[in-house]
């Protein structure tokens, strides 16, 4: 099974989550600012932060080019200082493209003094468990 991890980050929080997922799956995460290639895969882990209730422009742009025939399944991971995860609608945008969502993960991110030290060790452990669970579920159903 071919797995890719794509993320966009302004603060570095999503990179921490992507690196943890990559560690579990043995996959090198790709930062959209450095590599926005559209690679075919069986399962895409895609993540970003929520900034004023919206996704980053890089992530929005990347989604536009995804094709469900080349990327049939995705798992979403996000961080946010507020509860704006649902406002971003990352999973909804992927579903609109015809991509099956096989998992969603969100945790706190920090901004200035709000929710300092997030993502923390507990968040990292949780995203690792999420990644392992999603990969196991997808492998079992293939």
What do these predicted ranges mean?
Residues 3, 9, 13-28, 33, ...:
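FMN-binding flavodoxin-like domain, especially the glycine-rich phosphate-binding loop
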């Amino acid at each position: 099974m071919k797995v890719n991890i794509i993320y966009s980050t302004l603060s570095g929080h999503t990179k921490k989550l992507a690196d943890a997922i990559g560690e579990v799956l043995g996959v090198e995460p790709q930062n959209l600012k450095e590599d926005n290639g559209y690679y075919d895969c069986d399962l895409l882990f895609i993540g970003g932060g929520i900034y004023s209730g919206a996704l980053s422009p890089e992530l929005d742009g990347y989604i536009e080019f995804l094709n469900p025939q080349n990327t049939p399944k995705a798992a979403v991971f996000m961080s946010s200082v507020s509860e704006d995860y649902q406002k971003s609608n990352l999973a909804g945008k992927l579903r609109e493209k015809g991509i099956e969502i096989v998992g969603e993960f969100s945790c706190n991110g920090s901004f200035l003094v709000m929710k300092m030290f997030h993502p923390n060790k507990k968040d990292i452990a949780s995203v690792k468990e999420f990644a392992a669970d999603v990969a196991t579920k997808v492998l079992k159903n293939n």
